[in-house]
UniProtKB/Swiss-Prot annotation:
Xref: PANTHER family: MOLYBDENUM COFACTOR GUANYLYLTRANSFERASE
Keywords assigned by UniProt, alphabetized: Cytoplasm, GTP-binding, Magnesium, Metal-binding, Molybdenum cofactor biosynthesis, Nucleotide-binding, Transferase
NCBIfam families with a match to the protein in the record: molyb_mobA
Positions of Mg(2+) binding: 99
GO biological process, one term: bis(molybdopterin guanine dinucleotide)molybdenum biosynthetic process
Enzyme class: transferase
Protein name per Swiss-Prot or TrEMBL: Molybdenum cofactor guanylyltransferase
């Protein structure tokens, strides 16, 4: 049986490919990108947090608590994961980036089932790994902090070092598509209007 799990939306990046605009706040069909993630993610978790390092007031308007990085300096998604592990009120935390509006509706249940005895698991589709879609036990918080303090930043290397389980999401590559550029957003909006 799946326990209570805290979900954390990772919105703490610099959004350099979006011209510095906060990616999670980019409007898509009149709604901020991160709100699509909330809509898909919230039903899967018992509690939800947003990790953001700027524009926190705008994220708070969603009614979801906002947490910032404890280890500062825009050190990547691992800093947001560390913050999530630190602030979570549950033993397990699942992460998703703010720029994937169609994330799988079975993300959490599949990661939970696929983790087996591991303390962490991450998504993998038919083509590649998606390490920002990860489930972690809060006991990894200290190990993750040590990794970041050493100056390491590579998410996959950290997941490999803790023997995270790779969980296959066959036939779902399109659900992991992230919107990195304004052109990606335009294309996504066009597809949605065409449905």
């Amino acid at each position: 049986m799946q326990p209570n799990i805290t979900g954390v939306i990772l919105a703490g990046g610099r959004s350099s490919r979006m011209g510095g605009n906060d990616k999670g706040l980019i409007p898509l069909n009149g709604k901020p990108l991160f709100q699509y993630v909330i809509d898909r993610f919230k039903p899967q978790v018992s509690d939800l947090l947003i990790n953001a390092n700027r524009n926190q007031g705008l994220y708070k308007e969603s009614g979801i608590p906002v947490i910032d990085d404890i280890i500062t300096g825009f050190v990547g998604p691992l800093a947001g994961m560390h913050a999530g592990l630190s602030y979570a009120s549950t033993e397990w935390v699942v992460f998703a980036p703010c720029d994937v509006p169609a994330l799988p509706s079975d993300l959490v249940s599949q990661l939970w089932q696929g983790k087996k005895q591991a303390l962490a698991a991450y998504a993998n589709d038919d083509e590649r790994a998606h390490p920002t879609f990860a489930l972690m036990h809060i006991s990894l918080k200290t190990q993750l902090a040590d990794y970041l303090i050493r100056g390491d930043r590579k998410l996959m290397l950290f997941l490999d070092s803790i023997n995270a389980q790779r969980v296959k999401f066959s036939g779902k590559a399109d659900l992991f598509s992230n919107l990195n550029t304004p052109a990606d957003c335009d294309l996504w909006e066009q597809k949605r209007r065409g449905q």
